[in-house]
Amino acid sequence: MFFLGIDIGKNTHVASLLGEDGRPLFRAFSFSNTTDGGESLLTKLEALEASPSNLVIGLEATGHYWLSVYSFLHARSYKIHVINPIQTDGWRNKYPGNPIGRAGAYTRLVR
């Protein structure tokens, strides 16, 4: 089982992936908020043998920016947990201006 956390941004998202044992497999993969960006994320995941059957994704509902990545992944049958920003407010304060830290926090939350 794999656990992916995505920190959502207007133009760029940052992803962090943990293995079942909690070991980071990647911590700061940036990808653009485009179809090509989503495809680059899938390429990275497939290289590690992560697939819809063995991957859980968590992402924060940031404005409307999360909708495109959610739709992209949902259309490919990935299991996605949308996290309320109120729940993650403490992490934003712990990692101000640090999407890498927030992506890791979201990954640990869905694990």
Model-found features: residue ranges?
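Phosphate- and other anionic-substrate recognition elements at nucleic-acid/protein interfaces
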Residues: 1-111
